[in-house]
């Protein structure tokens, strides 16, 4: 890649700045951390690795980066692509082999969504491997749009008000998951991926499942953004400004104990000046 144009330079600086802000805001990476960067071969994880490698050079703290890819034994998976790329940029890496493809195909009927089971199997394997290599943080490539899509998926189809947190302590208590691209838009990541010419590997399991609920939500959000530019950013900001007293979850706010405050100053209506 040659010299960047003005717009390309702005794009790179914006992604680096937003990732740095997210890392700082949520204290994602600390001095001495060993960060396991989960690399799928998609645009998001390539971009995350690229940005983390840059931040590693300029950050005031020291931390290790180890790239990890999980070979799920999907038919036609180009096993040489990631090792060649990671060797070319001088990054320590591991390839974890686990035939989750066969398990998913056996358990999920033809035509049904494989994403949920596939992600659970992959997550469990990666948690175990992170523990084995002594990783203190596990970095995933989810971006702002992923977080918003998950929010609406849970609300529309699950009846819960939750999304993907930028930082998460796993249920096992032994893994801390971080999402450095939490503030970054998919549009910017797509443009950056094309700019950097990452060797993208498509997913044979879920890449062709056009009728997924997530795809429906994604198209809804894209349409909203087309009609009202900036709406996506505003909605994400809302996830950072939660007011439990204005919702209806009794576990988050004690509605039952609300009483009139007898010591409060009374309000008098001046009927003469109405």
Curated annotation (Swiss-Prot):
The keyword 4Fe-4S applies. One of its GO terms (cellular component) is cytoplasm. Keywords: 4Fe-4S, ATP-binding, Cytoplasm, Iron, Iron-sulfur, Magnesium, Metal-binding, Nucleotide-binding, RNA-binding, Transferase, tRNA processing, tRNA-binding. It catalyses: cytidine(32) in tRNA + S-sulfanyl-L-cysteinyl-[cysteine desulfurase] + AH2 + ATP = 2-thiocytidine(32) in tRNA + L-cysteinyl-[cysteine desulfurase] + A + AMP + diphosphate + H(+). Its EC number is 2.8.1.-. Pfam families: ATP_bind_3 (PF01171). SUPFAM superfamilies: Adenine nucleotide alpha hydrolases-like. It comes from the Bacteria. One of its GO terms (molecular function) is sulfurtransferase activity. Binds 1 [4Fe-4S] cluster per subunit. The cluster is chelated by three Cys residues, the fourth Fe has a free coordination site that may bind a sulfur atom transferred from the persulfide of IscS. The keyword Zinc does not apply. One of its GO terms (biological process) is tRNA thio-modification. Pathway: tRNA modification. [4Fe-4S] cluster binds at residues 115, 118, 206. Its cofactor is Mg(2+); [4Fe-4S] cluster. A motif (PP-loop motif) lies at residues 40-45. It is found in: Cytoplasm. It is an enzyme of class 2 (transferase). Homodimer. NCBIfam families: PRK10696.1. The thiolation reaction likely consists of two steps: a first activation step by ATP to form an adenylated intermediate of the target base of tRNA, and a second nucleophilic substitution step of the sulfur (S) atom supplied by the hydrosulfide attached to the Fe-S cluster. Catalyzes the ATP-dependent 2-thiolation of cytidine in position 32 of tRNA, to form 2-thiocytidine (s(2)C32). The sulfur atoms are provided by the cysteine/cysteine desulfurase (IscS) system. Belongs to the TtcA family. This is tRNA-cytidine(32) 2-sulfurtransferase.
């Amino acid at each position: 890649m040659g010299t960047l144009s003005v717009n390309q330079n702005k794009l790179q600086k914006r992604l680096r700045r937003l990732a740095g802000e997210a890392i700082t805001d949520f204290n994602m990476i600390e001095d001495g951390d060993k960060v396991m960067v989960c690399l799928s071969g998609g645009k998001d994880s390539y971009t995350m690795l690229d940005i983390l490698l840059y931040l590693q050079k300029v950050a005031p703290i020291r931390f290790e980066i180890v790239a990890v890819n999980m070979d799920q034994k999907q038919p036609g998976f180009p096993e040489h692509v990631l090792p060649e790329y990671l060797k070319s940029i001088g990054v320590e890496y591991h390839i974890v082999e686990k035939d989750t493809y066969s398990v998913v195909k056996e358990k999920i009927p033809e035509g049904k969504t494989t994403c949920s089971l596939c992600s659970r199997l992959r997550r469990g394997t990666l948690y175990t491997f992170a523990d084995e290599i002594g990783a203190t943080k596990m970095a995933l490539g989810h971006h702002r749009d992923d977080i918003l899509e998950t929010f609406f998926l849970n609300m529309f189809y699950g009846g819960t008000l939750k999304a993907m947190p930028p930082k998460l302590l796993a249920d096992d208590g032994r893994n801390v998951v971080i999402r450095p691209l939490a503030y970054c838009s998919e549009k910017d990541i797509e443009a950056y991926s094309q700019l950097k010419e990452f060797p993208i590997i498509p997913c044979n399991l879920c890449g062709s499942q056009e009728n997924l609920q997530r795809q429906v939500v994604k198209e809804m959000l894209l349409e909203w953004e087309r009609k009202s530019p900036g709406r996506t950013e505003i909605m994400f900001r809302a996830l950072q400004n939660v007011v439990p007293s204005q919702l209806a979850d009794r576990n988050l706010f004690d509605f039952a104990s609300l009483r009139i405050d007898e010591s409060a100053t009374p309000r008098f209506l001046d009927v003469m000046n109405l």
